[in-house]
């Protein structure tokens, strides 16, 4: 069972529950050698740091003394780990040696027998440089083994959860096919396999595309494991692309070669030995100088270096979790991807997939938008803004520029005559910013440095296309000046309540429909904050319809506002339909759980304001969705939406 608690980009801070044990994602699974004598880092430390580990059932199976202990006492006792134990099936050995001495069903039976929490099918790992024919042949065999493994578990009544590995080599259409076929089987976790050769060769562009083409076709309610990814420099990008789990033997393997992991690369202990201190404050680096550690006996040096590597690995995971909660994961990704040019290739290629990524990215975040480089132009926040500009119902448009020194929000620093013209400001980052919505996230909640000329030109084509599409509504400067002078001389501006007009446009941008018709425009009023002087509420006959949330200026409906949205928005827009059995709980304002969702607006994005209705489209409650439209239909565990209020019968 998997539940999302917080999110940013496609990263998910969630909880996986397996056999009553909980794993917080994203997380790393340290690789544990099934032979305790060969384990580099003590299991006491592993037990303190990890919720889940991964070990090798094939080595256990083929080593008589290990097999005997595992079969009599269980895998947890063998490796001395109390929480979730995942096992590989021998697929790695198959990829290295070309053959293994165990059958696909035999290894499933063994993993169940030794009490594994999550087992893995014996899939066929297919490296990136094989022919397409070979990749297709291997994939068909993996499908057969997967189907047989699922059938075996069901027929035998096995309790273990199963990994269904996605294969397909470098062929993206085969990755899609693999995800489609495997995704229809009842697997619990979906590892993306055979990417280690790509990572070893710094082919991060291909890694990113393999992840995305797999994610696009996998069920959203299952965790995704990036098999073999153990270097912390890759975690942020991989999490942003939707990976929940990683496994690492790197902490030990690198230590044996004297390599010192950091969050943005790898150093060599020998090259560091003349430094006064380590660039790290973990327990190992605090107790030893580089020279002291370098001069230790080899076995002890390896153990301590492995401990540092493990510390820095978990530290990066914790940093990513915090970035998800704070809403600045993209900034961390952009920072990490500048640690190596090939990693930057991985970041740049994802712009091709922004239509998919945007569907999973929250509409609002705790942190503002920080522009850290040219790649920021392709962030989902900007992509979404450009799309949602088309939601606004324009009558007359005037496009202009402002001085680079003009502070945001623009409308507070410009002498703008109130009228019914939509004034759009050319913006180097966001393309076009309508003055009437310029306080909404992320248009005012951003920090951008001085830009190079080529960056300033990035949106020229977008602006030209917008103006061409709306050419009949565009006013040139002479027409615009005449128009506003006409309003000024005839005092027509008295007929326009600029605050109400503004809120009407904000509602169009947020909800995609004209919520305030002409009749309502004359009846509603706004109320400004006494402290900030900014619009705070929209009221109808002294009753609050909407409140403008201070941090992002989104319009949050009160009960009457929810009723107005329900009236103005056609079904199923901004709706979540719930089962009749939980109507009373929704009316009482209690959270909506995923398993009770029957239908929804498929275009919903995470953290949008939603209407909770029954199958007859009767309004029951209103609140905020945690999941997007696809997830709402696929998740069957955890909270789907938190409610602000319910409507009593």
Curated annotation (Swiss-Prot):
SUPFAM superfamilies linked: Pre-PUA domain, PUA domain-like, tRNA-guanine transglycosylase
Enzyme class: transferase
InterPro entries: ArchSynthase1/Queuine_TRR, ArcTGT_C1_sf, PUA, PUA-like_sf, PUA_sf, TGT-like_sf, TGT_C2, TGT_C2_sf
Gene coding for it: tgtA
Catalytic activity: guanosine(15) in tRNA + 7-cyano-7-deazaguanine = 7-cyano-7-carbaguanosine(15) in tRNA + guanine
Enzyme Commission code(s) on record: 2.4.2.48
Gene3D superfamilies noted in UniProt: ArcTGT, C1 domain, ArcTGT, C2 domain, PUA domain, Queuine tRNA-ribosyltransferase-like
Any Gene Ontology CC annotation: cytoplasm
Annotated GO biological process: tRNA wobble guanine modification
Catalytic site: 88 (nucleophile)
Protein name: tRNA-guanine(15) transglycosylase
Cofactor annotation: Zn(2+)
Family: Belongs to the archaeosine tRNA-ribosyltransferase family.
Domain of life (superkingdom): Archaea
UniProt xrefs under PROSITE patterns: PUA
MF-aspect GO terms: pentosyltransferase activity; RNA binding; zinc ion binding
UniProt function note: Exchanges the guanine residue with 7-cyano-7-deazaguanine (preQ0) at position 15 in the dihydrouridine loop (D-loop) of archaeal tRNAs.
